[in-house]
A protein has these predicted regions:
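Sec-dependent N-terminal signal peptides
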Residues: 2-12
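Short S/T/G/P-rich N-terminal loop/turn motif that feeds into the first structured element of a domain
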Residues: 14-107, 116-247
């Protein structure tokens, strides 16, 4: 099962038209494993050196593309799909992603990056609808990812409307974070996979735990919280730790 996930927190002003609170975007996912035969210390040094050089190169570009790296925290083998970690590039449009890739390729040809300790064989894209968050973007974060399917007769707009209402209630109760809907696209698994993924993020492990407590103590069972489940079913989540690489 491919983990089609991303965490890119955005802040939006609340309004009465909840579906307009969602910002569309695109993302590219690259799944990686540490090369065999490398010690942990050697791989870490190579990774840090290459990532720093990559970030410096990417920060020099005048575009709206950013990248994060995610590491497994509460997961199992199926949830990881064999990957040690994965990268996500996020952008407002696929054109922006394509232009970024072309520019970075040309820059790497002129100034090669340090050797990588990773093998990255699988990649995919997804369309996202990013919902309102409780605060600003953070450089590190926790994120839960749920694979979901639509129920028969589901209304996606009504589902997102209920989620937006619930999110505002949850934030008002003291929860911190953001969320988004992720729709698999190019390179995604064929067959009977998820219709979409739902991701919910928190600024750090403490706020992640606090938001979980707030959900069960205060937010669970409200009209908006229950209304979400009229349109979807979701399997158990995986939890990942993320760090921002650039932008």
């Amino acid at each position: 099962m491919r983990i089609l996930l991303i965490v890119f927190l955005s802040f939006f002003a609340f309004s009465d038209d909840h579906d307009e609170m969602y910002q569309p975007g695109w993302a590219e996912y690259v799944y990686c494993n540490v090369k065999e035969g490398l010690s942990d210390s050697k791989a870490t040094k190579m990774f840090e050196k290459r990532l720093a050089a990559y970030a410096e190169m990417a920060e020099g570009l005048d575009d709206e593309v950013g990248m994060v790296v995610l590491y497994p925290y509460y997961t199992n083998e199926e949830m990881r799909d064999g990957a040690d970690l994965f990268f996500v590039r996020h952008a407002p449009t696929m054109k922006a992603l394509g232009e970024h890739a072309m520019t970075m390729f040309a820059a790497r040809q002129e100034n090669p990056l340090p050797a990588s300790p990773l093998e990255c064989d699988n990649a995919s894209t997804a369309f996202q609808r990013v919902g309102p968050s409780s605060g600003e973007v953070t450089d590190s974060f926790m994120v839960d990812y749920y694979p979901c399917k639509y129920k028969e007769g589901a209304d996606p707009v009504a589902m997102r409307d209920a989620q937006a209402k619930f999110a505002m209630e949850h934030y008002a109760n003291g929860a911190q974070g953001g969320y988004r809907y992720i729709y698999p696209a190019d390179g995604s698994p064929r067959g009977d996979g998820p219709d979409f993924w739902f991701s919910g993020s928190s600024p750090n492990l403490a706020t992640w735990g606090e938001s979980t407590d707030i959900f069960w103590d205060k937010s669970y069972g409200s009209e908006a919280e229950r209304a979400r489940w009229e349109h979807m079913t979701c399997e158990s989540n995986s939890t990942w730790y993320g760090e921002r690489v650039h932008n």
